[in-house]
Amino acid sequence: MSIDSELQATIDALVQDGKGLLAADESGPTIAKRFKTIAVESTEENRRAWRSLLLSTPGLGEFISGVILYEETLGQRADDGTPLPELAERQQIVPGIKVDTGKIPLAHAPGDEITQGLDGLAIRVDRYKQQGARFAKWRAVYNVSDTLPSRLAIEANAESLARYAAICQEAGVVPIVEPEVLIDGDHSIARCAAVTDAVLHAVFDALHRHRVLLAHMLLKPSMVVPGKEHAAQPAPAEVADATVRLLRGVVPAEVPGIFFLSGGQTPEEATANLDAMNRLSGRPWLLSFSYGRALQEPPLAAWKGQAANVRDAQQALLLRARLNGAACRGRYDAAMERAA
């Protein structure tokens, strides 16, 4: 199979109506914080048990087309010895991999950050592909204030995202490009929109320079929302209007799918906002989800680190996946939360 055919086959498998992505690629420190909320120690065995629980959830493939894994998970096995990526594949869920190595302060740019991981990336992507990964993810983050992010941070992160995407496509691995405008702070929805617009323009300029094929990549942006400390929190219809209006002006129609991150929203908020977007007309791309905490928070609370709670946790995950699947079609209703 040619590289182009390989990339297209992965896009076709990921971009499906009513399905989204499960982001299970938390770094060591992040998953330790999540486990702390349920008083569970972040050991290798507990992480393996948790991710095995997620990927073995019966029926998950009806609403989830792909899962983003952390490097550790590629080599882990379920209790019966099945490699965890294979658990996903059994439900036609495509395994993917987070390939960046985290963020550091950007030199000479106080308050801004830059993502690392380009050194040796081509070699790592080839290895991950041999382990079963068919797509990858790289996250850039942008802190927001009256003066942040700087132009330097916007351009430096766009360049890194584009270089990563080009390296992945050369290897036959679909890149997910994730520019996250952070929800931290008290900025307005208008400020978020202005920053997101500048960020996405820079990202697509860089993708063009690096000859990234837009038809063979996916975008994972944040929604246009105010900072979580802002006094006025908008209704889903306002978030949807602001987000889709901005995307129409920036994201080329060749991009096959936009998979939103939840970025600190509650599970219910993330679902309602996605649903509101899918009720709007004039969307050339599929609008879906790539949620981490917004999918995992309810099952994590149900699990509590206890094997006896696995079934309850899996039912909680399946419910959130089902509700987000409905939101992908513009058919979600808050009453569905209460009926569950």
Language model features: what each stretch is:
Residues 94, 174, 216-218, 257:
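Proline-centered loop/turn at the N-terminus of a beta-strand
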Residues 101, 142, 181, 223-225:
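Short, histidine-centered active-site or binding-site loop motifs used for metal coordination
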Residues 183-254:
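Catalytic core of soluble alpha/beta enzymes
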Residues 43, 138, 177, 219, ...:
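Conserved, mostly hydrophobic/aromatic
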Residues 67, 136, 175-176, 217, ...:
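Hydrophobic residues within beta-strands of alpha/beta enzymes
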Residues 1-131, 144, 232, 236, ...:
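Alpha/beta catalytic barrel-like cores
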Residues 71, 140, 221:
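Residues that line or immediately flank small-molecule/substrate-binding pockets and catalytic motifs
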Residues 121-206:
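Helix-rich catalytic cores of soluble enzyme domains
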